[in-house]
């Protein structure tokens, strides 16, 4: 028997050829993304978030480089003017800027080093050491986070006055040498990042408790220490109420000194915002220098989660 083989007409599709992807699906992937590749919408939202976050600082710099009359214009200015250094000179003439800057740097650095050091020690103890009452003590630490800071200002001020510390830098530093949030944050990080087997192995090799903490816990906790350090420095740098209560007007921090630029009858907002821009620059420099550690810590936390 002979078989008759037919040929498909020209222009007809073969049975095994895959159908082309729909154009609608391709457009959806470009907009919303697919898998690990973000889409246009993701980039658009990130850009909008970036602009909304950077605009207040940019607007402060614009008004700080102009006169006070710029606030009354119908359309707010978007480009800097030429009065920035004039306003900066007014800031230097009105407040003890360099003294306030030195106080803020000193206070923020001492508080940051103390909080990071004590929090890492306490967090490691709560996470990896077994001792009686550990869970109860940790519960007390967490419970203090629910108490508003303003509730303890009056009793704390009375203690500082009894000790004779009012007007001194120590009155600002001592109450914040360690924080409940720092202890809780480091404990939650170290409880997952350091395996118990690694600590037992170090003990079997003859390492002491201090040596284990130094060579095992600290290297593993560096990303979290960087994040806690940045957060603590920023909190100490921007603190206003407590330094205002315990420090004299002649020995201020940068935030309390900026409040001296305002008077009861007239406020030159261009001078105030010029001072605010100067006070923000150290934080921006810190974030630029420590940005790599910050991103590393966030990424490690995301991978563990």
For every predicted segment, state its role.
Residues 2-34:
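Short, Lys/Arg-rich, polar N-terminal cytosolic tail immediately upstream
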